[in-house]
Amino acid sequence: MNRLLISSLILSSIGNSAVAGNASKENHPNIILILCDDMGFSDLGCYGGEVRTPNIDFLAEEGIRFSQFKNTGRSCPSRAALLTGHYQHEAGMGWMTAVDEHRPGYRGQIAANIPTIAEVLRDNGYATYMSGKWHVTVDGAFDEPNGSYPVQRGFQKYYGCLSGGGSYYAPKPVYSG
């Protein structure tokens, strides 16, 4: 009796894992990653802030919150670390995008050999979209794609500005095609 029960459980679990394996490829969980510049840790309601942020609080409650992320004093090194999962120097963004210092950790953009989360997700069947400030392409590379634009680093669609600062009233557009 025990052999039959154990055999049934093993066969059942193999069958279930095969079905689950096929289903997971078709039903990827949705991933929404929000990065806000110039915001304090406790500015959001879900982190104890005084400002009401019910929609973000809902996403935080139903999803995953990062509470142990290394943040630099500058936005683009933090952005590069978040997009790649590497320390900013490993990703090529040790400082800012203002200049390519021709040193491996200070190229002013994400290194070509370091994959972004968008590239990994895209290659695994996800649709990848980004909106907002990119700010991980070296300044001066905005007129001609140089391999570091969002659509060249895994995002299928991108709506935003490439540089770190600018005017929402007079943005510098980048067009596809």
List where the protein language model places each region:
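Positively charged n-region of N-terminal signal peptides that target proteins for export
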Residues: 1-4, 104
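Sec-dependent N-terminal signal peptides
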Residues: 4-12
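Formylglycine-dependent sulfatase
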Residues: 18-177
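C-terminal segment of classical bacterial N-terminal signal peptides
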Residues: 12-18
